[in-house]
Amino acid sequence: MRPEVQQLLYADETGELEGVFEVQVMDPVPVDRLPGVRSLIGGEDVVAWSHALLVLLGWGDEVGLVEAERIILGRIENPFDGVDTHRLHGVDLTFDNIAHALALGLDLNGLSHDRVRALAERLLQMSGSVFFQNGLESLVTALADPSLTEQTEGAISGLIEAGKNREASDLLPALAVLDADRAVRMIERVLSAEGLSRITALGVARTYARMPNASSKRELELIEAREDLPGANSFARRTLEDWGNAQP
C-alpha cells in the first residue's frame, strides 16, 4: 500500500499511523481527507477499498453509505471476502466490520437512521449464513429501533436452532435494549441449548447488564462466582461495581 494511502486511512491527528478505528472516530472529521478516501472506493487495492469504506461510514459519509448499500443489499458481490478474517476461526469479517462502522457513523456522525435500519434488517436476515462477532449487536443497539424487535428475536432463535449458540449469545444484548422480557426468554433458550459455558457466558452477562434490576443482579453474582468463566466473571464483577453492589 502506498504511503500516501496509509496516511489517509490510518494516520491520527498527529500523523502517526494507528489504525482504521482511530481514524473512524476522529473528531472533527478531517474533511480534507474526504476526496482522497472516497477515491479509493472501487479501486484495484481491495484492502484500501475495504478500509476506505469503513472509514467513510464512521465519518457518516454519503459515498460510504451508498457503497455499503450496494454490498449489503446484494447489488454487487462481496468484493472483500477474505480480506479480513477472524484470527482464530478464519471466517470472513466483512459484514461484521461494516456493521460496526455503520453503528459508529450512526452514533458519531448522523448517518440516516432509516437507511441504516434497512441495512440492519438485511444483516439480521443474513445472520444465519454470515459470521458476526459483535458488529450486528452493536448496530442494532445503536439503532435502538423497536421495529427491529421481532426480527432480532427471530435471528437469535434461528442461530440457536442452527447450533450457533455463541453467535446467538453475542446478539442477546441488543434484544435487551429492544425488549427486556423477550431477552430473558431468549437467555433461557440459549442456556437450555448450551448451558452457561465459555461460549455463551459473556453474551449472557452483557445482556443482564442492560437490564439493571434485582433479578439481573442475582444472575450476575452467580456469573461473577464462576472461576471457570474468565472474561464473563470479570465483566460481571465490573458491572456490579458500577451498580454500587460490588461483592466484598
What are these regions (language model features)?
Residues 44-45, 75-76, 128-129, 163-164, ...:
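Short inter-helical turns and helix N-cap capping residues of alpha-solenoid HEAT/ARM repeat scaffolds
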Residues 88, 125-126:
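Short, surface-exposed loop/turn motifs that are enriched in glycine and acidic residues
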Residues 191-247:
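Long hydrophobic alpha-helical segments typical of transmembrane helices together
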Residues 7-29, 50-60, 81-110, 133-146, ...:
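Structural detector for internal amphipathic alpha-helices that build alpha-solenoid repeat scaffolds
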